[in-house]
């Protein structure tokens, strides 16, 4: 099968789109992507359901900045899951079905969340360190919603600048196969891809790896590990209960281990494969399948982050439970009030009132007749029978 990209040669030919049967390894890869996509939608929707009401709720002990970062993680994940649907469609049909603009948008959303998610986790670890270990002024500043939005906007702008090659070198590539010169027909297959010049690709991957992998990993480990040391030092100088201090230390250590393990397992293969592509050409089917599953690992980590932060934070769960209880109580009071108003409205209807009065009058009449009838019966039962009188008594 001959492949060529000479578009001018086949410009006026009849293009026949190549339809690849949905079978083989593409079936397993697409099924895996669809499964993780569904799980990602469910998990992020649940986290949004828990976190979003707390973002503007008063008197919440959890820092608003952390709530905002978790909210931003979920929104970014949902956008990435929507973009993943385009990749699934390409896997099913075997060719890209959309325009070049949609292709660029897909690659931007895909790359943006892969860079933004580690940075947001980096900011969360910094916020936890600031609120626990730094002085009160800086801790309160780091916990504010305004400060979190400013930091997020700076990180977002940095990522957009970093992604300029994706804007410049993303396009839909058309491959021409099996040309028929007699009928002037050619089979075409389209693929959405990011293919910059080799030098730009190398420096882009290197800078992206440092800024969105190495630096966040170092920051997450450093700031989270600093918290238990600070708590331990404070326990030695203050009268803090050992049980509560041990619980806090266990919680921090669990968070650090989970984040680090997920981060290393999901992101290390991804960045290794990005640089390995310059050495090995992916032609074997097994290598292509492995690359698809490696590409899936960052999606898994992005889904895991908001779930970990929500489940391990007791303050978020208790605050959400309180809001849900208040909403149920408010709904119950509204229901009771509506029922009371309906009953009042029914009582004030004139026709209903007259019928009710007539019913009461009729009931009273029946009761009076019944009472009179019972009294007469009792009086008659108290008198002797006429047949029992002697004859001499009759006058």
From Swiss-Prot:
GO cellular component, one term: plasma membrane
Any one Gene Ontology molecular-function term assigned to this protein's record: G protein-coupled receptor activity
Glycosylation sites: 180
InterPro entries: GPCR_Rhodpsn, GPCR_Rhodpsn_7TM
Bilayer-crossing regions: 38-58, 66-86, 89-109, 148-168, 202-222, 252-272, 287-307
CDD domains linked: 7tm_classA_rhodopsin-like (cd00637)
Function summary: Not known. Putative receptor.
Protein name, per record: Probable G-protein coupled receptor npr-29
Record organism: Caenorhabditis elegans
